[in-house]
């Protein structure tokens, strides 16, 4: 294992957020970056702009919605999967997987599920079940694996400024939380929560009601590490400064630092 910084960032629209993305990449220089909510077709992906600052990329776009990408600094990701197994009729661009710098990286954008109850929440739970089934084999792999992305789940009340305002939201429903816990029960390590078991860390601040200014946040962007990778976890955090920039996404990049030696 070599030292690596791996990040996940829901950009909430690649076209609108490209200057913010480039500024973050140049300042923080993650070795691997998983992006969600590109909201653009494949032909509009800014591969040349990313290559100009040293990043190779693979992507799966979708007009107006969804879309995921994996970036690699001074490298080209080697794609291994596009979409989760279990539903050949699912055309939404939500999962992309590649080998990068010796790590198998799964970049995911889990369905939001609102409004609930209803078909969107049912789709969220069905997608989650497919992820859980597929993740089991990845968890058991002898190769290092990270599942990084916007899970659209607030795991516990510690991960939100005030759960009372969100009780009816799909992100906090018992079914959503149970699915996330089932993932962890397979043996995945929630990197931020492992290093900061009691801290209120947020990755998302709604645009409305001055949530950023009041630090009324949610933690819904997660990096899960399998047992082959988790011993190398050295540090983790949130680049909250990105959320304070003009024309910012409502998410901030979340990252982990891996060491070349085991820490546990």
Residue ranges and their predicted role:
Residues 1-53, 59-60, 65-68, 262-264:
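N-terminal, active-site-proximal structural segment of metallo-dependent hydrolase catalytic domains
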Residues 6-10, 25-43, 105, 135-157, ...:
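Active-site beta-strand/loop signature of hydrolases that rely on acidic residues for catalysis
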Residues 53, 127-220:
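Metal-dependent phosphoesterases centered on the DNase I-like endonuclease/exonuclease/phosphatase
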């Amino acid at each position: 294992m070599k030292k690596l910084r791996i990040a996940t960032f829901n950009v909430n629209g690649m076209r609108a957020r490209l200057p913010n993305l480039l500024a973050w990449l140049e300042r923080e220089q993650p070795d691997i970056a998983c992006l969600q909510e590109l909201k653009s077709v494949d032909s509009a992906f800014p591969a040349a702009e990313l290559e100009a600052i040293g990043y190779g990329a693979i992507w799966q776009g979708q007009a107006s919605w969804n879309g995921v990408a994996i970036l690699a600094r001074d490298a080209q990701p080697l794609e291994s999967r596009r979409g989760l197994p279990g539903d050949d009729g699912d055309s939404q661009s939500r999962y992309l997987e590649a080998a990068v710098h010796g790590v198998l990286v799964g970049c995911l954008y889990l369905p939001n599920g609102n409004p609930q109850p209803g078909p969107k929440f049912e789709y969220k739970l069905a997608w989650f079940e497919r992820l859980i089934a597929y993740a089991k084999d990845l968890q058991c792999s002898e190769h290092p694996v990270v599942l990084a992305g916007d899970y659209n789940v607030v795991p516990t009340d510690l991960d939100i400024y005030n759960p009372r305002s969100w009780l009816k939201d799909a992100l906090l429903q018992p079914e959503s939380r149970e699915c996330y816990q089932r993932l962890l029960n397979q043996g995945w390590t929630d990197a931020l929560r492992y290093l900061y078991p009691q801290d209120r860390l947020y990755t998302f601040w709604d645009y409305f009601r001055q949530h950023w200014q009041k630090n009324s946040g949610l933690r819904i962007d997660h990096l899960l590490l399998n047992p082959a990778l988790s011993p190398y976890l050295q540090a983790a955090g949130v680049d909250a400064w990105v959320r304070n920039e003009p024309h910012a996404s409502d998410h901030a990049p979340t990252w982990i630092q891996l060491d070349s030696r085991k820490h546990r």
